[in-house]
């Protein structure tokens, strides 16, 4: 009898929860329409996978790519609408959030064709791979629009769980298993630290969880300059630091980059930084409004350490993926300059512009690494020697993307860094910008060292891997080369479209 009553109560509670969720989705679903498209794509993938055979594999790529493209289209149609707070204050829709969501969707759209040949050659499970990519994209999009502490915690956890599974996707690879274990342990520790910081912020504000209400709560409780806020700032900075991976929170990055499947690394290297940057700007700028001097100082230290350590250690690397891991640590140091400057001197606009260019430069480089790795089976930098003699297109594409990452004119990286450093200089960050300029010169050195190897034509320097280099007969080869071509073009000819890009970035503020 007791069991029967408990069962009825459980059914009633479940029904109420379902009706509440249905009510929220019915009245607020239009505010997350791009996200709903991805959810529909996920459900469709699961349905087709459970009712089809291996011959329908092309449909999986088509559904995933189409859902991402439609989601981008829906996002563009919503551009310039009035800011809206929905789901009882949990989610905010505005231009600033939407442009970061657009960048995440763009990353995922380019990463799927980049993964096709790799999946076919390694015989990875395709459906689960695409499901994890789409779910991680969904988590990143929700993080960009998160407006309360609970959503800011849950959304990155959705992204992180998929990231752990993707990094260990090749279960038979010992390096992949090692990378996954390090990533999981450090990710779990960082999440715990982040939640602890949120608890201090929650208590100091009098029990508020919405970002703007936290500010009002701190004013009402007179706790905005209390030690509790300083403790919250330190813990939250450490927690976000592991997501952004600046020095000294970068320990997991090289191992995960080296051990994970290359398309997964390409995906994580850009989407995680875009989503974490969007979240960091809102957390630091709104709840810690009264502690701006303190978090500016903390971020300046992180930026300096990242730019110096990332670029110096990258010089000594022998693996392309580890080199790009340390390079990404240096790159996030440049992005932090934009976060520090804020919207007073177009800091956010410069950060958004640079991240757009960074996506094309980084994904273009990883596309080249995927192709070379599949055709030779190596990742060693020295094994790239003489690639120009066998595949001029791949060698030139790699060279252009690397030069753009280094910031040489007239490539995209130059304009992105120029705008970013100029905004930092105008904001009075002279020392930070000087460090950025010096470390950019250092990065050009190790990029040029690789390009010299690519272009060498002397037989004694050409490695056996390049001598036996053969193009892949797979049709899917076209998809990865298409993705690579798009990234290379976006990395090389930004001067024509710089003014519209800057105008859009300047509009995408709070």
Swiss-Prot record:
InterPro entries: NADH-Q_OxRdtase_suN/2, ND/Mrp_TM, Ndh2_N. Pfam families: Ndh2_N, Proton_antipo_M. GO terms for molecular function: NADH dehydrogenase (ubiquinone) activity; quinone binding. GO terms for biological process: ATP synthesis coupled electron transport; photosynthesis, light reaction. It comes from Ananas comosus (Pineapple). Belongs to the complex I subunit 2 family. NDH shuttles electrons from NAD(P)H:plastoquinone, via FMN and iron-sulfur (Fe-S) centers, to quinones in the photosynthetic chain and possibly in a chloroplast respiratory chain. The immediate electron acceptor for the enzyme in this species is believed to be plastoquinone. Couples the redox reaction to proton translocation, and thus conserves the redox energy in a proton gradient. It catalyses: a plastoquinone + NADH + (n+1) H(+)(in) = a plastoquinol + NAD(+) + n H(+)(out); a plastoquinone + NADPH + (n+1) H(+)(in) = a plastoquinol + NADP(+) + n H(+)(out). The chain crosses the membrane at residues 24-44, 59-79, 99-119, 124-144, 149-169, 183-203, 229-249, 295-315, 323-343, 354-374, 395-415, 418-438. NCBIfam families: NDH_I_N (TIGR01770), PRK02504.1 (NF002701). It is a multi-pass membrane protein. The keyword Plastid applies. The lineage of its organism: Eukaryota, Viridiplantae, Streptophyta, Embryophyta, Tracheophyta. It comes from the Eukaryota. NDH is composed of at least 16 different subunits, 5 of which are encoded in the nucleus. Keywords: Chloroplast, Membrane, NAD, NADP, Plastid, Plastoquinone, Quinone, Thylakoid, Translocase, Transmembrane, Transmembrane helix, Transport. This is NAD(P)H-quinone oxidoreductase subunit 2, chloroplastic. One of its GO terms (cellular component) is chloroplast thylakoid membrane.
């Amino acid at each position: 009898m007791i069991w029967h009553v408990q069962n009825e109560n459980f059914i009633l509670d479940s029904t109420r929860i379902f009706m509440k969720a249905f009510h929220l989705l019915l009245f607020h679903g239009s505010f997350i329409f791009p996200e709903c498209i991805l959810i529909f794509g996920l459900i469709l993938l699961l349905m087709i996978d459970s009712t089809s055979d291996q011959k329908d594999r092309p449909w999986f790529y088509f559904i995933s790519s189409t859902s991402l493209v439609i989601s981008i289209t829906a996002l563009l149609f919503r551009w310039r609408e009035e800011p809206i707070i929905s789901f009882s204050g949990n989610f905010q829709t505005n231009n600033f959030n939407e442009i970061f969501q657009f960048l995440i969707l763009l990353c995922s759209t380019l990463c799927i064709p980049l993964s096709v040949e790799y999946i076919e050659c390694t015989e990875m499970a395709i459906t689960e791979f695409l499901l994890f990519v789409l779910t991680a994209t969904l988590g990143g999009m929700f993080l960009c629009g998160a407006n309360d502490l609970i959503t800011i915690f849950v959304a990155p956890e959705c992204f992180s769980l998929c990231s752990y599974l993707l990094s260990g996707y090749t279960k038979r690879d010992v390096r992949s298993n090692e990378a996954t274990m390090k990533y999981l342990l450090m990710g779990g520790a960082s999440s715990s630290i982040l939640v602890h910081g949120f608890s201090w912020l929650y208590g100091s504000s009098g029990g508020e969880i919405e970002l703007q209400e936290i500010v009002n709560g701190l004013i009402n409780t007179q706790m905005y300059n209390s030690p509790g806020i300083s403790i919250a700032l330190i813990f939250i900075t450490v927690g976000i630091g592991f997501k952004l991976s600046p020095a000294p929170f970068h320990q997991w990055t090289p191992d995960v980059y080296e051990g994970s499947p290359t398309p997964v690394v390409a995906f994580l290297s850009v989407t995680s930084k875009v989503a974490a940057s969007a979240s960091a700007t809102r957390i630091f700028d709104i709840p810690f409004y009264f502690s701006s001097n303190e978090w500016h100082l903390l971020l300046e230290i992180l930026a300096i350490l990242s730019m110096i350590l990332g670029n110096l250690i990258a010089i000594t690397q022998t693996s392309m993926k580890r080199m790009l891991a340390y390079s990404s640590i240096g790159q996030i140091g440049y992005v932090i300059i934009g976060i520090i400057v804020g919207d007073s001197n177009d800091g956010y606009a410069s950060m958004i512009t640079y991240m757009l260019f960074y996506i094309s430069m980084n994904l273009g480089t990883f596309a080249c690494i995927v192709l070379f790795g599949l055709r030779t089976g190596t990742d060693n930098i020295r094994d790239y020697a003489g690639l120009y003699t066998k595949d001029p297109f791949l060698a030139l594409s790699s060279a252009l993307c690397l030069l753009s990452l280094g910031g040489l004119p007239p490539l995209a990286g130059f304009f992105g860094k120029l705008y970013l450093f100029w905004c930092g200089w105008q904001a009075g960050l002279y020392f930070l910008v000087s460090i950025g300029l010096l470390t950019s010169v250092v990065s050009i050195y190790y990029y040029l060292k690789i390009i010299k190897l690519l272009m060498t034509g002397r037989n004694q320097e050409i490695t056996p891997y390049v001598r036996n280099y053969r193009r892949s007969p797979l049709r899917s080869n076209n998809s990865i080369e298409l993705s690579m071509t798009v990234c290379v073009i976006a990395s090389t000819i930004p001067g024509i479209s710089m003014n519209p890009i800057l105008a859009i970035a300047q509009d995408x503020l709070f």
